Design a protein with these regions (language model features):
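Membrane-embedded alpha-helical signal segments
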Residues: 1-184
Length: 184
């Protein structure tokens, strides 16, 4: 590995980690303008009719925070349009986009043999968390006591380290209704 490729890798990671903060409204508007010139129907009727530019910016930032590619702006807008009649909450709309892109996202993390290395929750814990789901300011969250929350955080951290030390991206595979709350 030469020093140029190491530098390139570090710069790429740096940009990825700060991408949500770098994505401002002007950039989002320019992206939408480019899409509108190619595919007007993708944008018209969605922004600002269904959601505002700043709400869409929040959705894109949420996706970038989780390293979800936002290249398919037309597809993202379609998912947002299909779900904006139910909610305008950026976290929930970003989650709908993630779920729609599940196949694409999983392909990003498969190894050379096509295997996806993940860890999962114990069925009893999954059940307990499912029954503790409740609404929060960020959309949805778990309403569990502090000791259980800390135990979950500790065990999750351990499992993430195991995967990372094995050279894999640490991924938790859980039911979609738990994912957003677990992420937050």
């Amino acid at each position: 590995v030469n020093s140029l490729s190491v530098l390139s890798t570090h710069l790429t990671e740096l940009v990825r980690s700060y991408a949500p903060d770098l994505l401002n409204r002007q950039m989002v508007q320019e992206m939408l303008n480019q899409l509108k010139s190619r595919s007007p129907a993708s944008v018209e009727g969605v922004i600002p009719e269904m959601i505002s530019l700043s709400e869409f910016q929040s959705i894109l930032r949420n996706l970038l925070r989780e390293r979800v590619p936002i290249r398919d702006l037309s597809g993202i807008l379609e998912v947002v349009a299909n779900n904006a009649t139910i909610t305008r909450h950026p976290n929930i709309l970003a989650e709908a986009v993630r779920q729609t892109m599940a196949h694409t996202l999983s392909s990003l993390y498969r190894d050379d043999t096509g295997t996806l290395h993940v860890f999962t929750l114990a069925p009893q814990l999954e059940s307990a968390l499912r029954s503790s789901l409740g609404a929060t300011d960020s959309g949805v969250g778990f309403q569990v006591d502090a000791s259980l929350a800390q135990a979950i955080i500790n065990k999750t951290g351990e499992q993430m380290e195991v995967l990372a030390h094995s050279g894999y991206m640490p991924l938790l595979l859980c039911p979609r209704e738990l994912r957003l709350a677990f992420r937050r």
